[in-house]
UniProtKB/Swiss-Prot annotation:
Record bears the keyword Transport: no
InterPro entries from the UniProt entry: Ribosomal_bS21 (IPR001911), Ribosomal_bS21_sf (IPR038380)
Protein name, per record: Small ribosomal subunit protein bS21
GO molecular function terms attached to this record: structural constituent of ribosome
Residue spans of biased composition, Basic and acidic residues class: 37-53
Organism expressing this protein natively: Rhodopirellula baltica (strain DSM 10527 / NCIMB 13988 / SH1)
UniProt keyword annotation of ATP-binding present: no
Region span, Disordered: 37-64
Source superkingdom: Bacteria
UniProt biased composition (Basic residues): 54-64
Family: Belongs to the bacterial ribosomal protein bS21 family.
A Pfam family assignment: Ribosomal_S21
NCBIfam families registered for this protein in UniProt: S21p
């Protein structure tokens, strides 16, 4: 959970900007997007497998 204490003489716009940065860094938005819809375990495994294949392909191409 992200907590933000508004500093002395800090405008609302500055506080909101700081809050957005904290949320982005904590990964909350990314996690919300990922959990927005249910994904079958087979789809999760498939996505992970494809990501690993791409990563391996990239490392093989770079090592040549």
């Amino acid at each position: 959970m992200v907590k933000l204490l508004v500093r002395d003489r800090e405008t609302i716009q500055e506080a909101v900007r700081r809050f957005r940065k904290l949320v982005e860094r904590s990964g909350i938005k990314k996690e919300m997007r990922r959990r927005e819809f249910y994904e079958k375990p087979s789809e999760t495994n498939r996505r992970a497998r494809l990501r690993a294949e791409r990563r391996n392909k990239r490392t093989r191409m770079l090592s040549r």
